[in-house]
């Protein structure tokens, strides 16, 4: 479970994220949806411990900054960061050792295969394209057998085959009872994945939707319902 309580992030006098609270339960895919600049990545980086913030973040009932929480928390950043001198496989093996993961050698072998990196395993971090680095980041996040997974704009830079594979991975994690949070502005890419959706605008969550409660409305209809002005000039709050 991932729980965010009154998360606020300021840069000087500018409020980037304003008292945001939400929860994603075990076995759910949560979508943090909004235009560029809405505050999605700031929330993601705060949850990941990359930014200082006010408020609270809980991972399976533990404080997000605790070592216990970090051991079960997989994170795929918007901009992947690689070790220049490590190969693709060495990245995965490094994560295994750093997290003391129980991932098997067979599972390590399978990860590059799933994301078409099998013939790239000996390439160094500084030899990888943006798309390949994104795939390695996903493999590393999966290598710890996470209970909570957070992905920031994960489909950007991926080829169609990798996007399809990533969607399958997300659904597999959901079936295993994992908590997944995806930050994106690409509605089409997540329309078949989500269980709960949080629509952001100007640093605030302006609407929350549960897929079980919205009848036959699709994700685009819901999003534009709350982000586009009403007829007659009125706007949704």
Where does each model-flagged region fall?
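Helix-to-loop junction immediately C-terminal to a conserved catalytic motif
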Residues: 48
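Conserved ABC transporter NBD signature motif
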Residues: 55-69
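Conserved ABC ATPase "signature" region
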Residues: 93, 103-120
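Conserved ABC ATPase signature
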Residues: 124-131
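Catalytic Walker B motif of ABC-type/P-loop ATPase nucleotide-binding domains
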Residues: 149-153
């Amino acid at each position: 479970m991932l729980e965010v309580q009154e998360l606020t992030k300021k840069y000087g006098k500018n409020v980037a994220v304003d008292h945001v609270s939400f929860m994603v339960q075990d076995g759910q895919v949560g979508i943090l949806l909004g235009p560029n600049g809405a505050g999605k990545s700031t929330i993601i980086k705060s949850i990941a411990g990359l930014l200082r913030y006010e408020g609270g973040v809980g991972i399976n009932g533990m404080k997000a900054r605790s070592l216990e929480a970090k051991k079960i928390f997989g994170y795929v950043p918007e901009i992947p960061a690689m070790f220049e001198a490590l190969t693709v496989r060495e990245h995965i093996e490094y994560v295994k050792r750093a997290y003391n993961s129980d991932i098997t050698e067979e599972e390590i072998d399978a990860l590059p295969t799933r994301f078409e990196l099998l013939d790239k395993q000996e390439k160094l971090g500084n030899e990888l394209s943006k798309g390949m680095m994104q795939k390695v980041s996903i493999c590393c996040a999966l290598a710890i057998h996470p209970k909570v997974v957070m992905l920031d704009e994960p489909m950007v830079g991926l080829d169609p085959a990798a996007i399809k594979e990533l969607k399958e991975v997300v659904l597999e994690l959901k079936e295993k009872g994992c908590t997944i949070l995806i930050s994106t502005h690409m509605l089409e890419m997540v329309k078949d994945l989500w269980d709960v959706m949080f629509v952001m605008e100007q640093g605030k969550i302006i609407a929350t939707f549960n897929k079980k409660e919205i009848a036959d409305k699709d994700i685009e209809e819901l999003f534009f319902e709350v982000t586009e002005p009403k007829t007659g000039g009125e706007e949704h709050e």
